[in-house]
């Protein structure tokens, strides 16, 4: 399978960092890179990140004051992109499932949602409201990296209200 680049923006995240990284390292896929981008932590977050990078060579640590999302995308070498915040990674097969869903369905985006399952190539959910349920949030989605090639400042697309139409067009 192709590599997944996982972009983890951090800022004073020492309380959650170990849980996040441990959850990633327990995933059933190994072909991944974990790109941690610190945007100016004033606590021990950056030191913790560097310690993790010495323990596992798939973990890369960067510092920037610029857009952490765009910075992470520029550093990513994988075919697929996952943005991660404080998501609980209780399912050790989450990345594997998301990647398989992308490949099997020739999709651009795979959305992880515990309320959905794929049954014989049909997506079955409790409810779907494309504007509210799938609006703008980066954190539970696996993207094909080439989806971002036509956007210069992807962080702005997902943060500003004026870009809502662009966000929706990505999912429709």
For each of these PLM feature ranges, what is it?
Residues 22-31:
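Short, acidic, metal-binding catalytic loop of nucleotide-sugar glycosyltransferases
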């Amino acid at each position: 399978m192709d590599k997944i680049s996982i972009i983890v923006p951090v800022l004073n995240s020492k309380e959650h960092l170990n849980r996040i990284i441990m959850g990633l390292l327990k995933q059933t896929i190994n072909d991944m890179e974990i790109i941690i981008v610190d945007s100016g932590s004033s606590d021990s977050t950056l030191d913790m990140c560097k310690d993790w990078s010495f323990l596992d060579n798939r973990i890369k640590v960067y510092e920037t004051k610029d857009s952490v999302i765009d910075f992470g995308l520029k550093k990513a070498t994988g075919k697929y992109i996952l943005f991660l915040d404080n998501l609980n990674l209780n399912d050790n097969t989450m990345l594997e499932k998301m990647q398989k869903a992308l490949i099997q369905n020739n999709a651009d985006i795979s959305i992880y949602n515990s309320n959905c399952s794929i049954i014989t190539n049909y997506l079955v959910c409790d409810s779907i409201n494309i504007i509210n349920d799938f609006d703008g949030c980066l954190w539970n989605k696996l993207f094909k990296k080439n989806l971002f090639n036509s956007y210069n400042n992807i962080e702005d697309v997902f943060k500003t209200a004026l870009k809502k139409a662009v966000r929706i067009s990505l999912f429709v």
